Amino acid sequence: MLFRSIPSTMLGYKKDLPDYDYDPQKAKALLKQAGLEQGAEVTLWSMPVQRPYNPNSKRIAEMIQNDWAKVGVKAKIVSYEWGEYLAGMRKGEHDSALYGWMSDNGDPDNFAGTLLSCDNIQTGSNAARWCDKSYDALVKKALLVSDPQARAKLYEQAQEIFYQQAPWITLATGKTFYATRSNVSGYTVSMMGSDFSKAKLN
């Protein structure tokens, strides 16, 4: 269940949204509706680096390319040096691209706002360059609310809009594993980094 604007571990994750259907015929109909009955040609940017959420960008790009070809979208896979790739994404030079994010602070706004707010089109962190005023209002309101349950409801409403509009498709989430020896105690794994202040060797 990846079709959300925030990860399942965060406040406000909406569990009850159904998966998108696999429907090539509907995809063709939508292309026709957009005036692209004869198909389309696009570039698909593939990251030149491995990331926890995307260890093989080239292979994933090839799989997408293959699926899109079935509905008449011809994708040319391109890649650039990582710095150039990031700069191009921020400027909106891509037609479509593989991209990802890892939370800086564990707050849902670090996904819902940082990656999708209208304001962040200009900063470049909204790589989808999507702006929905209703979504934006919910996310901005959530920043001003201190009650966790009230915040969660606002993010859930925002995710419904995200789900309907689909400014991006979440393909995968990464899992990071930490191992400790049996003689280590007091070490707690944290999404915000490693804290060894209470760790001991027994």
How should these model regions be labeled?
Residues L44, N66-N120, L154:
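Periplasmic binding protein-like
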Residues I64, V71-V73, A179, V184:
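Hydrophobic aliphatic residue packing
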Residues K15-D23, V49-I60, I77, E81, ...:
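Extracytoplasmic/periplasmic, Sec-exported soluble proteins
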Residues R4, A34-P52, E93, A97-W101, ...:
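Bilobed periplasmic-binding protein-like "clamshell/Venus-flytrap" ligand-binding domains
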Residues F3, P24-L31, K58-A61, Q65, ...:
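Extracytoplasmic/secreted envelope proteins and their assembly/folding machinery
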Residues L11-K26, L36, G88-G92, G113-L144, ...:
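Short, solvent-exposed loop/beta-turn-alpha elements that line the ligand-binding surface or hinge
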Residues M1-N66, K70, L138, Q157, ...:
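Append "and occasionally in soluble cytosolic enzymes with long acidic Gly/Pro-rich linkers
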